[in-house]
Amino acid sequence: MCIVIGRKQEIAELNRRLKSNRAEFIAVYGRRRVGKTFLINEVFRDNMVFKHTGLSPYDKKKRMTMKDQLQNFYFSLVRHGMDGIEPPKTWMEAFFLLEQYLTRIDNGSRQVVFIDELPWMDTARSGFLTALEAFWNGWGNARHNLCLVVCGSASSWIIDNLINNKGGLYGRLTLEMKLHPFSLGESEEFFNSRGIKMSRYNITQAYMILGGIPFYLDYFNPAYSLAQNVDVAVFLKMQPKPTEIVSQFVHHLAFAAAVWNVPRYKTTFFECFQNF
């Protein structure tokens, strides 16, 4: 595993689950760019036997359908060595193929299955959640060497459908982990690991601007000043930039402008939003 900044408690807990002698169903969630996928890849790298990432629904030309997601899952199976199989038509078939694959390669050692961006796979009327339930309840939870790790940036989906599930997946998670942005101290540690020398005042400013998100902090160039790095990371159109920051600025500035323009006699929260 490469050097991971911070995340000491998270790494320790994930390693503890990795070494347990029982089936584990782990859900990791948190906002975008916070480092969920990176952390999971690094901790479970040596034991990961299957990895799949759901297709983003945010396509400019079309919205991803159940057929698209199933085809992508089929390609992941083939990529991992499942030759001679027909593309699944339902999620029940897809998870059954995954069962067959895991059974075929089982040598008794820990099997980590990582499904990234799980919420994206649950398209309308796809039966995805029911199939996931059948996979875990009917097969996975009896496999003492299986560790199913799911991840997603759509935190509300993870919370509603896994953590607070009232159906067949009620209480099935063995670990739920919310990954938070870096603290101020971890941000300083991150900059030091990248050879970026800044005063603590500038580190604090960077933290206030970028919020301790590792993906954004990684844009910093040690040859640039704080102002130059912020320009490159956020504002320069010709450079790679975290566009989410720009959209967040626009949203908050619009909200502030709406509140600022509310007449003084309009004091209720509801009335403020009517002007937004």
Q: Model-flagged regions — what are they?
A:
Residues 1-276:
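Phosphate-binding site recognition
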